[in-house]
Amino acid sequence: MGSQAIKTNPKRKTREDIFELSAPLFARSGYDGVSMRDVATAVGLTQAALYYHFADKDELYLSAVACEFRAREVALRDILVDNGTPWERLERFVTGLARMMATEKDFLRLVQWVLLDTDEARQSVLAKHVFKDMFVAVHDLASELDPHQDAH
């Protein structure tokens, strides 16, 4: 039996390319500082082609932020459920997050812009659909900590 090439979904590949190229734009300039025209130019698409993939800038922005966050979430979640005491896991989590922020400048800037965003609808979508699992995992770890015990 001959080998068969696995066909990829061209729309999915293009969406991934758009995320990869638009996230640094949002990281540098924030939501308000990036236009769909800027993204289309960076990606090498027409605006019409960009709108084929995303209904509006909100959808693109939220999808790009989600993609960037999820790309890093697995490593952080592994730390939270790894071996060790709750204090040790919390320390490794904070260290890992700090290292991530120190070495991935675009991700750091994107997180800063997300935190500064005053649009309640976007904040709500991100909190409920992107950050919720991580918030719950950190909360669960915190609930394991003995408040009467010093970490050291």
Question: Residues of each region from the PLM?
Answer:
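Amphipathic, well-ordered alpha-helical segments in soluble domains
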Residues: 44, 60, 68-72, 103, ...
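Amphipathic alpha-helical packing segments from all-alpha helical-bundle domains
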Residues: 70-78, 92, 120-146
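Short coil/turn segments at alpha/beta junctions that flank glycine-rich nucleotide-binding fingerprints
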Residues: 28-32, 83, 104
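Short, intrinsically disordered or compositionally biased N-terminal tails of bacterial proteins
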Residues: 1-5
